[in-house]
Structure formats: structure tokens, C-alpha cells
Amino acid sequence: MNKSNLKGRIIYTGSTELNTYVYSGELLTSSDKTNLSHPIQLNNLYHYDSSNQLVITEGLEDVSAHFALFFKNQDLIKVPAKTVAVLNKYMTKDKLYDIHPDKDVAIELCLLFLSNLTDTFFKMRDTQDVYEKAGWKRLKAQILNEQLTGSKFESDTRKNIIAALAAGTSKGIIAECDGIYSKGHHSFSYRLGPAYLSKGVESYEVKTKYVKQLLNKAYFKAISETIDNPICKNLIKVYGSIELPTKEEVLAEGRRLVKEKKKTKKGKLISSLNKHKKEYFKDADKRSFIEESIEIFEYLTDNGFMVPRVGNAKSGGRISDSFTLMPSWIRNLVKMDGKKMIEADYSALHPNIAMSLYGGSKEFITHAEISKESGIDIDSVKIEHLSFFNKTEKDMYKSNLVNYYSKNELTMLRNLLEEKRTSEFEHKITSMRMFKKEVDIMTEVIKDLNKVGIYVIYVYDALMCTESDKEEVTKMMNNVIINHGVKTIAK
């Protein structure tokens, strides 16, 4: 295969939020015999459908040359710190043999399950959700079955793994289940035991053939979901042109932001731990520490880029990848073909989407306008708008924005609240509809940009592009959004 276009370029894509990996580096065509035996982990939950192998040989003319998916080590997964050692040294043989007749396979299956909980280390540090703050995470039984056995059907393997981890070792329980299940609403939740909760992350290289095959099956599922989505196809094509900052560059930028007392989009003061523990800072919850941001960056990129993941209906189909999950101040250091990237985004997109969906009277609302009319400082308006419409009715009435909307957009507010009260999805229906509208808009924008040869990094309601493409990108964004009935402008 022709690899001349790769010469002289150092490109690596990395491990991600949920250890999702992409394989890359060779051009794939229907006639290639490329070895695809290494794995991709999809959202820490491994999916498999044997028919997915056909996807590799069909319909890839426009994306095959861009499955640029480089690994440093193709068999790495991310697991909670200390779990590898404790499973090997202290888990009793009888519990392992209940899982699989091969002890080494049983241990790796336990690690595979635990890899689903790895990202709680990061989520616990940066969430206001009480459930996530305590380390809990919902995992669907059907997907766990597929991850751990290659089949969606119920099996004793999953149950025996959970039982073994809950029983634990002489060092304590390794993971626990909350035992709360509601059909059609939420699955069982799991979290790490006290000895492993918030203790960090480590890399583990899978060694057994059986577990490698499970990982391999996830590879085909990941690709099949990626190539069917316009945003994902765009991302696959752009990854090969991306240059990540070095750790030294990230650290230097972080120190600059600390010195200048900059804040994140959520209003947190960018700070440095400076070798202190977080407990040293009385207002730690109001700070974003550069050391933790660098940990996330390395987690997302130290072994390749994440396979873009299409969210479910509850997320409106939003796409997650290494860049949507990356701290924004680090993402701003990324380059495309050696060129600095800048962001193009819509002005007050979600308030204007709410106007469109729920019968609002105003058009082209801005944060500045709301700040002026409400007397709330503009930074607080921006931060509160990140979550205002998605809250429960009770929490919306606690917001400092509710008075503005009650006074200026009462019909819109009543329509929105009525839907929350009557929908089977309750208050979550609002975010579902608004995210769906956002995704529809961004999908059309990206498709139109790709037609003229422009590829971008997707960040939910914003796009990152080179400075030379900015004018065309904002023009396309403005053309598309008007056709969707949302009155705002891109800048």
C-alpha cells in the first residue's frame, strides 16, 4: 500500500475518555489484507456484531485513506490504579475459576469490567452531580455481556465477575453494585471500593488471546458506527493533520494562565497545585488545577485518539471524542498542518434554540442583552446558560435567570416547563430536544464544509478551524442555522 504521504510526519492518536482507541496508519481498501487483529475499545463497553467485518470492505471509498489511526501500543487498556496487582496477588482461585477456567483470562476479564469505571477518577473531581461525585456509574447489562463474552445474551460470566469484585480480597472490596434497577429508566450502578476509588489510573497490556479477541470484536463495531456519521467521518479525516502540543508546551501555557488569573468557561479559576494536595485550598471546588487538566490530556492522548462515539437519543446524538473531552485551554494549543486553530461558535446558541423550540418571541438573543436587562453580570449569565434549560423545574426556579425569562419570555418558559411535566423523559426531554437540534445543525454545517474541502474539529456547538478557513466556516454556519429556524449568528 502507498504510504508516501506519511513520510516525515509524526502523528499519534491517543487513548481516551473511556479507553476508546482507533487503529490507523495504513490505507484500507476492499482488497487489502491488513491485519486488524488489534483492538479498539468502544466507550469502555465492547460491542460486537460479526456482520460488522463487512463494513471494512464496503462503502469506504471516501474514508478508507483517512483511517489514520496510530497506536503506540495496540493492546493497552486503562484500568483503576492498584487493581492489576491486587487481582494477581490476592483474588482467590475459586472466584477466578468461577469466571473462566483459565486464571489469567479470568483476571483480564475482571480488568476489562473495571476499565468501565476508570473514568470515574476524572468525573468525581469535576462534577456537581452527587451521584457521580460519589463514584457511581450506570452500566447496561446487555452491553457488559457483549463486552465480556462477545454475546449480548445473559451469561454467568458477568454475574461471576461482579460477585468476585464485590466479595473482594483481604485488601477490601474491589467494586460494588448499588442493586437499584428500573426497567427502561436506568441500569444498575457500580463504583470502585474505597481502596481504589480516586486512586488514579494505570495502563495494562492485555496478554491473553481470549481477551484480545474480545477487544478485536469491538474494533469492527467502532468503525461501523463511525463511518455512518458525517461528523465522525469528518473527524477521521482531520485526525491525520492534527499536531498535539508537547507536555512542556501545555505546562508553559498553564502557568501563563495561572499568572494571568484566567478562568475556565465554567467560571473556575485556573490554578496550580504547586505540589500541594487539593485539600490545601479551601475553595478547591472553585478552581481548575492545571496538573489535573494535564492528567486528562495525557489520558486522552497517550496511546492514540479516541474513536468518535455517537451518543444515544438522550444526548441528542452528540459526538464524543478526544477533543470534546479535552480541557479547552489545552485544546486551543492544537495545530492543524502546523497552523494555529481558532474557534467558531454561535452566539448564545441554546437560549436561541429554546426560543425556536418553545415559542419564544425574541430573536438573536445575546448573553450581553440578558445581562443588561437582568442586572446579572455577563460571566454568570454565560455559566448559568450552560445548564439552565436542562434542569428540573424545581432547580430552574432556583436559578438567577428565571426572573428574566418569567418577565420577558413567559410563554416560552410555560411551554418548556409543561413539556418537562408531561414527558416520559421528565426534565431530561429539554436537553434531548435541544441537543438534537444542535447536532442537526452542526451535522449539516460539517457536511457542507466537507463538500468544499474544509475539515474541522467538532466541539459540540463550536468548530475549530485554521484562521484561513474561519470566514468560510462562519459563513456556512450562518447559512445553515437560519434554515433550521434558529435566530443567532456565528462568530
Predicted regions and their residues:
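Helical catalytic core of nucleic-acid polymerases
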Residues: 90, 99-101, 128-157, 314-429, ...
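Catalytic palm active-site di-aspartate
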Residues: 345-346, 385, 455-467
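Short amphipathic alpha-helical interaction segments
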Residues: 153-170
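Conserved catalytic core of nucleic-acid polymerases
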Residues: 2-6, 14-16, 32-106, 112-124, ...
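A short, conserved structural fragment
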Residues: 166-182, 455
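Acidic, glycine-rich two-metal-ion catalytic cores of nucleic acid-processing enzymes
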Residues: 181-376, 460-462
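Polymerase palm active-site segment centered on the conserved acidic dipeptide of motif C
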Residues: 469-491
